[in-house]
Amino acid sequence: MLPWPTEAPGARLADVRDTSLAKIVRDEILARIMRGELAPGRRINEPDVAERLGISRVPVREALRALESSGLVVSRKNAGVFVRELAPIEVSQLYELRAVFDAYAGRKAGALPDAARRALVKVLDAATAGMRKAARRHDVAGYYAENLRFHWAIVEAVGNARFSDAYRDVVQQLHLWRIQNLSQGLAMAASVAEHDEILRAIRAGDAQRSETLMASHVHTAHGRLENRLYKETSR
């Protein structure tokens, strides 16, 4: 599972008994942003979205307001709504926040009761196997998806819906930056090794080590991304 829709839910528009139309439209737009179809800086045309989905502009407007509150789009007076472009300082702040979140989740995961921890470890085993396979194929998109599954499984294991929501907002915003900068091939083998260490700590029920490794992993990942971006812009 990923912390955002992986497919545009347009087919659900015919059945809104359990979900508000605005939320379905929000998920539709969000899925397109996360897939990179609506890139950072691109204007989202409200009438076009409404016409494509065969609905009025009211739920589209509500959906865009929800996305703005999540930090994914920005509204500019007399210009419209645009997919947000992150400044480097914002990215650094988000990574600092994510490191705190991941450390907390790692500590909680390492302290789970045995049965719950074993269930989590099965999911993490599958995700690390997927990362390893993607790394061998040099499949950056596949690797990133498995990486997200790994971290999201740990976050969900905390069992705190508000924490999961806050983490989701941070990861979604960081994903904008990845799309914006098209970072590729980010030392996947080294990253797999870091995930293996985290997995071993959680499997052993070592909450303190899980916490430390999760924070270190996020800081190291940020450093790798920054170094690659610096090299690309220095060419």
Predicted regions and their residues:
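Short linear motifs at protein or domain termini
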Residues: 1-111, 222-235
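Short helix-capping/hinge motifs at transmembrane helix termini and TM-loop junctions
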Residues: 110-111, 159, 183
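Short alpha-helical transmembrane interface motifs in multi-pass membrane proteins
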Residues: 87-88, 177-181
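C-terminal regulatory/effector modules of DNA-binding transcriptional regulators
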Residues: 29, 52, 186-235
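Conserved amphipathic alpha-helical segments that form helical-bundle/coiled-coil interaction surfaces
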Residues: 94, 98, 116-179, 193-200, ...
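Acidic/polar helix N-cap motif
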Residues: 87, 139, 205-206
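Short helix-capping and inter-helix turn/linker motifs at the boundaries of alpha-helical repeat units
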Residues: 20, 121-122, 186-189
